[in-house]
Design a protein with these regions (language model features):
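Phosphate/pyrophosphate-binding catalytic cores of soluble transferases and nucleic-acid-acting enzymes
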Residues: 1-221
């Protein structure tokens, strides 16, 4: 998302100068970005890079996007009227989590309690399909359309170390101007816009509107 460099930990100018980066700082916070849109954009950029004789490297982000490239898209019906999303938007965070635990305990335990967006999305998918995310993924047929061959590298840290690093990183980001970045975005965008509903921005927006104690901000994020 544009204007969200600190909170989304975008690569620094120095890092971006070292090699060309794609799909960074290109989307308005008011826009919704779907797995389908990502797959389409990836296919275009992948071809551009390989046509130049270079090797594309897919870095970071949500595991769902990698799954989309490997297995194709999940078959989820569209909420054409928007009624399901409207109903869920009216629920509190605790209500979302309680309802999710009842119908999809795996997603409930996998998704961080503060991640309203992913918790709500998992609940929305269940309401639209009658199936949990894990059920949909297990029934998915691999999509050979992309024909990608790649090594997969990842870091596997102890959970305690991971939590410690997250806490340190959150404090560094807050000290680096994350609150000011969010305040600037709120001058032109609603706190309910897709970008500002992501982890951290949502809690900072709540803090700025006095819905959340500033002393508990870092812990809530």
């Amino acid at each position: 998302y544009k204007g969200m460099r600190i909170g989304t930990a975008q690569p620094s100018d120095l890092e971006q100068a070292a090699c060309t980066h794609h799909l960074i700082d290109f989307l308005s916070p008011d826009e919704t970005y779907s797995a389908q849109a990502f797959r389409n954009d990836f296919c275009i950029i992948h071809k551009e890079i390989t046509d130049r004789g270079n090797l594309p490297i897919l870095v970071g982000g949500a595991g769902m996007y990698l799954t989309v490239l490997k297995n194709g898209l999940l078959e989820i019906p569209q909420d054409d009227t928007g009624d399901v999303r409207k109903q869920l938007d009216d629920l509190s965070d605790s209500q979302i989590r309680t309802n999710l635990e009842k119908v999809d305990s795996e997603s409930f335990h996998r998704i961080h309690p503060n991640d309203r967006y992913r918790s709500q999305r998992a609940l929305e998918i269940f309401k639209l399909t009658g199936k949990t995310m894990s059920q949909l993924i297990s029934n998915q047929t691999p999509d050979p359309a992309l024909g990608l061959e790649y090594p997969l590298l990842f870091l596997n840290r102890e959970r305690s170390e991971l939590h410690q690093r997250i806490a340190q990183r959150t404090n560094v980001m807050l000290q680096s101007g994350w609150i000011e970045e969010t305040a600037g975005l709120l001058e032109n965008h609603s706190a309910t816009s897709p970008g500002l509903r992501s982890i951290g921005y949502r809690e900072i927006a709540m803090s700025l509107s006095n819905e959340l104690e500033k002393d508990s901000l870092s812990e809530r994020i």
